[in-house]
């Protein structure tokens, strides 16, 4: 009588092949998700810079510039008359706008806000940092890796 079924060797070969394919797939998927998060973060940075530059231009043409869906405070006074305290307040309003109105979360840890105060030196992974440490400019920085040197920074000058 002939037994039907697979031998132990055949089963072990199949399990080994599945294991190798799974290991390769996990590495490839990990690289794919890292690249997608990095690209999303860089895109968020570029969009926020374009948004701020266009809003700052409104001030130059006599229009009003509001943040946080609030029509109560025109930010143009902070843009057109920069100083250390006004730039600092503008920075805080920008951070609040991106976190609350846009609902930004940290791409690598969605329990954290997506935007915070900081510069290229102290911008942590996954954040779009806004710095207003110099009275005539806003600095937007994004850090897309654990390595501190992997960041993109853009300076937006005030007082158009």
Question: Could you describe each region identified by the protein language model?
Answer:
Residues 9, 43, 49-50, 81-83:
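Intrinsically disordered, low-complexity segments enriched in polar/charged small residues
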Residues 14-16, 24-25, 45-50, 54-57, ...:
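Functionally constrained cores in energy, signaling, and assembly domains
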Residues 34-64:
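Membrane-proximal N-terminal amphipathic helix
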Residues 57-160:
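Periplasmic/extracellular, small/polar-rich flexible segments of pilin-like filament-forming proteins
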